[in-house]
């Protein structure tokens, strides 16, 4: 298994698919990385040479925030929203949808399981 920016990439996957296992890299960015490093995206990870792996790794670290660094930035942004007390920060704080979705009958994922009520006889 190839290790790029601290993530083990599965050997049997094509390179452009395997790169999406890295937090912060989606399909479009994976193809862009492979294009700029002159590596065939249809090549399997197990067939990559050490030189190609190091080229990909260097390109990613030089051009993008990924994994822990990106997670920390997102977390800091959310903390800042909470601290300044804006609408989005308040919604994050109380665990409700942030982007204007309706919550009367939906948003179960964000709100958590239903609180059951005890029925009176």
UniProtKB/Swiss-Prot annotation:
The lineage of its organism: Bacteria, Thermotogati, Thermotogota, Thermotogae, Kosmotogales. GO terms for molecular function: rRNA binding; structural constituent of ribosome; tRNA binding. It comes from Kosmotoga olearia (strain ATCC BAA-1733 / DSM 21960 / TBF 19.5.1). Residues 97-121 are annotated as: Disordered. HAMAP family: Ribosomal_uS13 (MF_01315). InterPro entries: Rbsml_uS13_C, Ribosomal_uS13, Ribosomal_uS13-like_H2TH, Ribosomal_uS13_bac-type, Ribosomal_uS13_CS. The gene is rpsM. It comes from the Bacteria. Keywords: Ribonucleoprotein, Ribosomal protein, RNA-binding, rRNA-binding, tRNA-binding. This is Small ribosomal subunit protein uS13. GO terms for biological process: translation. GO terms for cellular component: cytosol; small ribosomal subunit. Signal peptide: none annotated. Belongs to the universal ribosomal protein uS13 family. Located at the top of the head of the 30S subunit, it contacts several helices of the 16S rRNA. In the 70S ribosome it contacts the 23S rRNA (bridge B1a) and protein L5 of the 50S subunit (bridge B1b), connecting the 2 subunits; these bridges are implicated in subunit movement. Contacts the tRNAs in the A and P-sites. Residues 101-121 have a biased composition (Basic residues). Part of the 30S ribosomal subunit. Forms a loose heterodimer with protein S19. Forms two bridges to the 50S subunit in the 70S ribosome.
């Amino acid at each position: 298994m190839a290790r790029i920016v601290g993530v083990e990439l599965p050997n049997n996957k094509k390179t452009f698919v395997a790169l999406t296992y890295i937090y912060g890299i989606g399909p479009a960015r994976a193809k862009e990385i492979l294009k700029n490093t002159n590596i065939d995206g249809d090549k399997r990870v197990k067939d990559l040479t050490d030189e190609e792996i190091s080229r990909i790794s260097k390109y990613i670290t030089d051009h993008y925030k990924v994994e822990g660094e990106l997670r920390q930035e997102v977390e800091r942004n959310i903390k800042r929203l909470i601290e300044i007390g804006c609408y989005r920060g308040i919604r994050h704080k109380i665990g409700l949808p942030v982007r204007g979705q309706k919550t009367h009958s939906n948003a179960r994922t964000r709100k958590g399981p239903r609180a059951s009520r005890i029925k009176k006889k």
